[in-house]
Amino acid sequence: MIEEEIQCPKGQEDTTMKLNTQYAVDQTMRLLSIDSPTGYTRNVTDELLSILREMGFSPVRTRKGAVACTLGGKGHPLALAAHVDTLGLMVRQIKANGRLAFTRLGGPSFNAVETENVTVITRDGKRYTGVVALRNASSHVNRELDSEKRDDSTLEVLLDEVVSSKEDVEKLGISVGDIICLDPRARVTPSGFIRSRFLDDKLSAGMLLALAKGVADGSVKPARKITIFFSVYEEVGHGASSGLPEDTEDLLVVDMGCVGDEITCTEQQVSICAKDSGGPYDYSMTSELIALAKEHAIDYAVDVYPAYGSDAATALRSGRDIRYALIGAGVYASHGYERSHVKGVENSLRLIEAYAEKE
């Protein structure tokens, strides 16, 4: 459910920009309204195809389900990649008492999913609401409530249906393997903060749509051939293993920037990643991004991410001979209820714009 969608706060958007921050935020909210946990992304890619076709482009969906769209330009092909698959859950077992055991899709924090509203989607498209709860979750009954470990053996989904047995649940059409979607609770505050699950990475997807719009309306002039790529299995480690154009020379992954202890970046900045769990990013390409940020007075930070992987590593492991770099708006509380800011979007768009037009 999208709780609130408001305009970017006045005075916080750079009016000299060619790319539209408000449009990027609007498209982010649009994408957040569509459930798309890993393995259940058809609806969100249908939306991407529709948006891009309305702009006059000819996007394609790969067999694996990703969306690729060439925006124009000539020579030295550059791909910009974001992912539209999100974290989620899947029915692992229907318990004898009518509650659901689950397995995680990707790596949502167990602590962060407790008490979250969910929607269970059956194979035939029925939707049932529910909530993630700890077994024996009443504090007036369970004296060990605060100390009990949260994991997939102690957390369960309670359906908003009158059920008390496995048979009751099966009569609803719910089966093992059904998708369980977490409520994103997306909103933009009057002070410019963007709060939602799955800003990783629908915030970046919104920014790539803003780039496409900038090219479509002629405000951005690509200095080279540019393709935008939306992967759908990033959260489980094989998003960009296929589907990137064969002629790609450089890959700029646009994914969430880390915010936290021992990290320089804030939610208002664009983060440039020097190294993550898989090793350093391409030195020359990363240096180009840093130089552009300085040249254009973009508010940026360079950081090392201690527990992070991206579609760049996936593409490299598939054997691609490419340069690769990673940028993104600063996002706090990753894989939980995340927070960023419109200034982080703005600074990211300014860097994307500068790199797209770089000779």
Segment roles from a protein language model:
Residues M1-E359:
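N-terminal hydrophobic/helix-forming segments and targeting peptides
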